[in-house]
Amino acid sequence: MTPSISWGLLLLAGLFCLVPSFLAEDVQETDTSRRDSVPASHDTPYNLELSISLYRELGHKSTTSNIFFSQVSIATAFAMLSLGEKGDTHTQILEGLQFNLTQTSEADIHKAFQHLLQTLNRPDSELQLSTGNGSLLNNDLKLVEKFLEEAKNNYHSEVFSVNFAESEEAKKVINDFVEKGTQGKIAEAVKDPDEDTVFALANYILFKGKWKKPFDPKHTEEAEFHVDTVTTVKVPMMTLTGMLDVHHCSTLSSWVLLMDYLGNRTAVFLLPDDGKMQHLEQTLNKELISKFLLNRHRRLAQVHLPRLSLSGNYTLNTLMSHLGITRIFNNGADLSGITEENAPLKLSKAADKAVLTMDETGTEAAAATVLQAVPMSMPPILNFNKPFIFIIVEEHTQSPLFVGKVVDPTRK
């Protein structure tokens, strides 16, 4: 085996969020039980701070493009990878993922990932959320037993033997794994594995959620969306009127809307005041998001939200380097804890692919028309007809499942 073997990590986040059907809520409902069930954010390995850091790095690349990624997939894959790292490479990964190694032990980090993956994969009749990890190893190599055992126990990783010299065969194994896990939503996760690849790591997450309060398709109409000061596009705009979690945050100069799914998932939408998107992006922090989730502001309001179909496809090498994770991508990487063969490995490629669909489809809401007629005077109106940010969160752990920015909803 040659002394310079590249390890191709294919970090493939298959996120499919189907957002139909809000079941009607009684307007007298309170949020006490919901608030009491949310733990402190430090209990989660997928912290909000990392989501914001990743978002800002992607935002720096372009201010005119939609953004959509899964922090869950990115963090899971790199944390799992750290099981086979040693020395500075190992430390860089965990610190780059925003862990304070003086306060949290490595064992606790991996146990926290184990707990979160168990939480996310727990059967729930109200929504579908599943994740998966696959380790694909060249057929002439063997994984270190300790790495294999810890990856399986903490990250539920499946292991596949692949002949990477046959690129079509390797591509099919990887794509079949991701396509099956995402129920066909991501059919081609990878086009051509690098020719020197001997090990690949594939990760996916599938999420299908239904709104607690459904949008009535009868009220969806074509409307204008202002991409910028000179560009306007036509989009299908959904409308909902009722008791909603809505308030204006003066710190962010933005309106905040929280929309719950059936099950313990919540979407946080952030609509900046005119000209305040940059201020929102620079000021947003984990403390504010946590506060929004804990302190609800229910009021009568009307919301106009565009129907969405987004995707994100990113090469993570540069992105993660900006977070301080550099050694793993060069010849100084120490990944000797992965394979038994004494061959130097480095990470040749890391990629993230995510898909989102957000619409009003689903069960009919019998009380939707009644809610439309509730106000005696016009309620506050939130019109998401200009660029906005959204974060979908697992509430028990305050773990961000994915983050997005909508600049132009007509771009997929």
From Swiss-Prot:
InterPro entries in alphabetical order: Serpin_CS, Serpin_dom, Serpin_fam, Serpin_sf, Serpin_sf_1, Serpin_sf_2
Keywords in alphabetical order: Glycoprotein, Phosphoprotein, Protease inhibitor, Secreted, Serine protease inhibitor, Signal
Residue numbers marked as site, Reactive bond: 376-377
SUPFAM superfamilies (UniProt xref): Serpins
Domain of life: Eukaryota
One Gene Ontology cellular component annotation held by this UniProt entry: extracellular space
Tissue expression pattern: Expressed not only in liver but also in kidney tubule cells, where it is regulated by androgens during development.
Positions bearing carbohydrate: 100, 133, 264, 313
Entry-linked Gene3D superfamilies: Alpha-1-antitrypsin, domain 1, Antithrombin, subunit I, domain 2, Serpins superfamily
Signal peptide: 1-24
Biological process, per Gene Ontology: response to cytokine; response to peptide hormone
Domain comment in the entry: The reactive center loop (RCL) extends out from the body of the protein and directs binding to the target protease. The protease cleaves the serpin at the reactive site within the RCL, establishing a covalent linkage between the carboxyl group of the serpin reactive site and the serine hydroxyl of the protease. The resulting inactive serpin-protease complex is highly stable.
Protein name: Alpha-1-antiproteinase
Species this protein is from: Mus caroli
Gene name for this UniProt entry: Serpina1
